[in-house]
Amino acid sequence: MFEYLTGLITMVSPDFIVVDVNGVGYRVAVANPYAYQEDDQQAVQVFIYQAVKEDAITLFGFATQAEKRLFTQLIGVSGIGPKSALAILATPDHQGLIDAIQNGDDKYLSKFPGIGKKTASRIIIELKDKVVAVQDEVQLDFTAPGPLGPSAALQDALAALESLGYTTKQVERVQKQLEGLQGELSTNDYLSQGLKLLSR
């Protein structure tokens, strides 16, 4: 079983990243791929959960041990699979997620894809006491995977550009220019600027 991978990010896609470890590329599913950046110089550490099925082995990656622990707690709830757990962890507000579980806020949990009221209630019942251990064991710093990645607003804008039909390479081409923009920009601001850059 893998505990973590330390290597270079050689590919970033809407659903996964590729971590090159000594010339071997590992495809790793992560909640927010665009929090990572392709970099052939600076290695990053990605914590790993390995899911083994009869027909496939899937690696799920996390920026911190705390995020990985929360993931394993979520998939331990009946009705929550790895993909649903990743979708939940895609929210940038992990503290808000934990608060919702502790406070019994099923409306907050029901907003995630594939999570109905019954499943939200199960999450609360089964994890209300367990998520405290995540806070006690590891400082909550879910959003810093090695080198600093783009903001949540920029991540959303990059994902939106791909959903509009632009290729990963096209989006990556304008990403650094968008990161250099000054001021606090919204997703729409980044999207508008990105479209202008791509139209050149």
From Swiss-Prot:
InterPro entries: DNA_helicase_Holl-junc_RuvA_I, Hlx-hairpin-Hlx_DNA-bd_motif, NA-bd_OB-fold, RuvA, RuvA_2-like, RuvA_C, RuvA_C_sf. It is found in: Cytoplasm. SMART domains: HhH1. GO terms for biological process: DNA recombination; DNA repair. Transmembrane segments: none annotated. Keywords: Cytoplasm, DNA damage, DNA recombination, DNA repair, DNA-binding. Gene3D superfamilies: 5' to 3' exonuclease, C-terminal subdomain, Nucleic acid-binding proteins. Residues 143-151 are annotated as: Flexible linker. Residues 1-63 are annotated as: Domain I. Residues 64-142 are annotated as: Domain II. One of its GO terms (cellular component) is Holliday junction helicase complex. Residues 151-200 are annotated as: Domain III. It holds the Pfam family RuvA_N. GO terms for molecular function: ATP binding; four-way junction DNA binding; four-way junction helicase activity. Homotetramer. Forms an RuvA(8)-RuvB(12)-Holliday junction (HJ) complex. HJ DNA is sandwiched between 2 RuvA tetramers; dsDNA enters through RuvA and exits via RuvB. An RuvB hexamer assembles on each DNA strand where it exits the tetramer. Each RuvB hexamer is contacted by two RuvA subunits (via domain III) on 2 adjacent RuvB subunits; this complex drives branch migration. In the full resolvosome a probable DNA-RuvA(4)-RuvB(12)-RuvC(2) complex forms which resolves the HJ. Has three domains with a flexible linker between the domains II and III and assumes an 'L' shape. Domain III is highly mobile and contacts RuvB. The RuvA-RuvB-RuvC complex processes Holliday junction (HJ) DNA during genetic recombination and DNA repair, while the RuvA-RuvB complex plays an important role in the rescue of blocked DNA replication forks via replication fork reversal (RFR). RuvA specifically binds to HJ cruciform DNA, conferring on it an open structure. The RuvB hexamer acts as an ATP-dependent pump, pulling dsDNA into and through the RuvAB complex. HJ branch migration allows RuvC to scan DNA until it finds its consensus sequence, where it cleaves and resolves the cruciform DNA. Belongs to the RuvA family. This is Holliday junction branch migration complex subunit RuvA. It comes from Limosilactobacillus fermentum (strain NBRC 3956 / LMG 18251) (Lactobacillus fermentum).
